[in-house]
Amino acid sequence: YEVHLILKGSVIVGIFTGNPKDEPLHYGEVFSIWTNLATGYGMIAGYQTFYNHAGDQDLKKIIEDFIQCARDEVKQLEKILKTNGVALPPAPPERPEARIENIPPGARFNDPEISAALSMDAAAGLVSCSQVMGMAIREDIGLLYAQFHTAKAQLGAKLLRLNKEKGWLIPPPLHVHHPLH
């Protein structure tokens, strides 16, 4: 990468030029990518566990979509960290498939619980992606997280629709406007 330094008053200002991928990551970008990668590893294992516990076939399909989304993100984040000489965080092992009948009913996550956890993850993921998009100075990092954001928003919309169809959505108190007479 090429850095041009310009002296303005008593402050040196760095101006990056050329391909953003040739620019160094700043510490916030490194920390965010590393943290998101560690989180992605954990989510894959957690979603595999949810898949084993889920009984509803529509929910299982969405869980597969969440796993694939996380795997896609992990692959891209690993590449960025490796390219920039940053050690990868540890990853839990993949979860083996289990038969739902072999999980005792009291020890099993039920479908509405799984769906609620996925909804929470989708919402938190949107916030996390937005935060990285806002602090990134490398255009490629900001755009990558914009892609992650879009994928999470689409998964969240599918999940919301499923929650409504299955009757799993527990709405907060609703504000209903009643006209004054």
PLM feature segments, named:
Residues 1-12:
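Short, Lys/Arg-enriched N-terminal segments with co-localized hydrophobic residues
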Residues 12-16, 79-116, 120, 171-181:
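Carboxylate-rich helix-loop segments that flank metal/cofactor sites and access channels
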Residues 16-18, 30:
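Active-site flanking loop/helix segments enriched in acidic
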Residues 25-33, 57-75, 111-114, 139-153:
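Alpha-helical scaffold segments that form or flank carboxylate-/histidine-based iron centers
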Residues 29-51, 100-147:
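Acidic/histidine-rich alpha-helical segments that form the ligand environment
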Residues 57-93, 155-166:
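Conserved alpha-helical segments that form or flank metal/cofactor-binding pockets of metalloenzymes
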Residues 121-181:
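Preference for long, well-ordered alpha-helical segments
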